[in-house]
Amino acid sequence: MKKAGNVGKKEYAVWIFVFAVFVFCLAWALAAPFDASPDESMRYQIVEFIAKHGSLPDGRDPEIRNANWGISYAFNPILPYMAGAVLVKIVQLFTASFRATVIAARMVNVLLGGGMAWFTWKIGELMFRRKEAGRFFAVLVCFLPGTCFLFSYINTDGLALFTTAWILYGWCRACKEGWSLSVCIQMGIAMGLCMLSYYNAYGYLLMSAVFFVGCMMKCQEQKWYWKQMMKKGCLMLGIVFLVAGWWFIRSGILYDGDFLGMKTSSIYAEKYAIDELKPSNRVLPVNMDMSVLDMMLWVPGSWQHNWLVTVLVYCS
């Protein structure tokens, strides 16, 4: 009876925490001026296009092309913008207020912030023996100003944070209970959604593969579970394809085999961007014939330190 009571208190605590994160992100989303955050107007154009036309935009469409950059965010995965368009259409049934539609589009990330809070709390429970340490970990991660900021405006970064938290939760579960069917299905869904977020989150997909393969080896006997590895690995890959494959197939068809859309985006930036923002005119390592080591030691503009020193200080 006492154990059941403790479990109930634990669940009660996690939902209080999720609600607190949700309210904080919502308050920030309600207070933030439109386009005060990075490229929010460009991102909102995608939401607006989907809500207006009821279809997904082509990244080359002049209607959504930014006059300065010469490109649009439609070249990249747009899942949060699709969800935002649904909420915008619902809000438009009641009001034509521009501010209301912006808040509706932001609500996708506010909800994702609450979802990340749940996964972070659960990760803390699995990683730390003392509940206080786990809760401190969750608070530290979810109330980091940068984290809350990303859940306050229209972007795909929020989905990246949500899915990477889900992936890390899957890793923790795999360590505790093995690669069960439930864990494999969750990992497949999480990785598929991660592919529909930002490309800079793909490192978690690579490390998930490394982690999974490592888990399939017996640590003491140094033998591989080949059959289980293939069976469960194919299951997860199949789920990833079902969740995310459609987007990359679509991009490949639209952009003549450019399934990531990055090459086409660069071509259009070079063609339509203002002179100082054209890829060929920007101060980039690739345009300066830098090696990887040169990039690490490079001190751009008015920065005080190079990349290597910055990373070392941050990690310390």
Could you describe each region identified by the protein language model?
Residues 183-199:
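Membrane-interface alpha helices of multi-pass inner-membrane proteins
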Residues 103-128, 166:
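Transmembrane-helix motifs of polytopic, lipid-linked glycan transferases
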Residues 173-176, 204-241, 254:
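Perimembrane helix-loop-helix junctions
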Residues 146-159:
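Short acidic/glycine- and proline-prone juxtamembrane loop motifs at membrane-interface regions
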Residues 21, 137-142, 191-195:
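Short helix- or helix-capping micro-motifs
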Residues 255-316:
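Membrane-lumen/periplasm interface segments of multi-pass, membrane-embedded glycan/lipid transferases
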Residues 9-41, 48-58, 68, 236-253:
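Transmembrane signal-anchor helices characteristic of membrane glycosylation enzymes that use polyprenol
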Residues 12, 96-99, 120-143, 162:
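Transmembrane-helix signature of polytopic, membrane-embedded enzymes
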